[in-house]
């Protein structure tokens, strides 16, 4: 049985069956973010292991990682680094290609967004297959960052994303898991 906190978080997350395709249970975290108490508690729970530790910046993955990452950066008095899809940033960038189910995509960040040795927390709303999070972590590591942790509200453990980050030596923190998805 799950704790009251985890059960309340799960209740705050809308499940949309058969979206974006049949057989998929889409976990919509925007309902949690729209609930002030649930959102604040989620941010607090993601932050508390790192409060008092040196965290230079929080890197958020487009798009919901921006919302969550900005709140976490604020609480940790850290800077914020957006990791975006190719072509969305206006200055000199570094990018990485990664595989999708049906092709290849790229993500990027500003070349001067982090300095070698900076301690970074990587953030997104959910980890599923881990392809996007793995690419973001590799990009940060290539830039010389030390990734303190990767934080997500939701883990879909059956899809194996967490293992990809752990294989890179990145600790993973999640708040709730939806198994069987």
UniProtKB/Swiss-Prot annotation:
Cell location: Cytoplasm
EC number: 2.4.2.7
Quaternary structure (record): Homodimer.
Record keywords: Cytoplasm, Glycosyltransferase, Purine salvage, Transferase
Function, as annotated: Catalyzes a salvage reaction resulting in the formation of AMP, that is energically less costly than de novo synthesis.
Family: Belongs to the purine/pyrimidine phosphoribosyltransferase family.
Domain of life of the native organism: Bacteria
Pathway: Purine metabolism; AMP biosynthesis via salvage pathway; AMP from adenine: step 1/1
UniProt-listed InterPro entries: Ade_phspho_trans, PRibTrfase_dom, PRTase-like, UPRTase/APRTase
Name of protein: Adenine phosphoribosyltransferase
Organism, scientific name: Brucella anthropi (strain ATCC 49188 / DSM 6882 / CCUG 24695 / JCM 21032 / LMG 3331 / NBRC 15819 / NCTC 12168 / Alc 37) (Ochrobactrum anthropi)
A GO cellular-component term linked to this record: cytoplasm
Reaction catalysed by this enzyme: AMP + diphosphate = 5-phospho-alpha-D-ribose 1-diphosphate + adenine
Molecular functions per Gene Ontology: adenine binding; adenine phosphoribosyltransferase activity; AMP binding
